[in-house]
Amino acid sequence: MSEVMDYKSRLSDPASRKFETFSYLPAMNAADIRKQVEYLVSKGWNPAIEHTEPEHLMDSYWYMWKLPMFGETDIDRILGEAEACHKANPNNHVRLVGYDNFAQSQGAAMVIYRGKTV
């Protein structure tokens, strides 16, 4: 069995902090984010945009940007709302969530804009 290594992420080092699954991978560019939105839509999940201040990142509650986009399938419209949220809250973390109606849970959640680190 291979040895498990500690990941070098510390609260004292803002650049090393990890948020969710995708934060352990290289940063996604616009094309990668678009593919994730396409996947979310292809699964029939309802997209929503959430944001929070960096100091409240680990809290359970994030602010919802407008309402969930029930039934929205236009990729550009979803990405446009995420960008609008980021422009209105430039220092906040912004994440995209895909709500699965049938499982009554989140099918996906990822930070797509990182806010100012504290």
Swiss-Prot record:
Organism: Thiobacillus denitrificans (strain ATCC 25259 / T1)
Signal peptide from the UniProt entry: none
Annotated family: Belongs to the RuBisCO small chain family.
Pfam families: RuBisCO_small
SUPFAM superfamilies recorded: RuBisCO, small subunit (SSF55239)
HAMAP family linked: RuBisCO_S_bact
Protein name: Ribulose bisphosphate carboxylase small subunit
One example of a Gene Ontology biological process annotation: reductive pentose-phosphate cycle
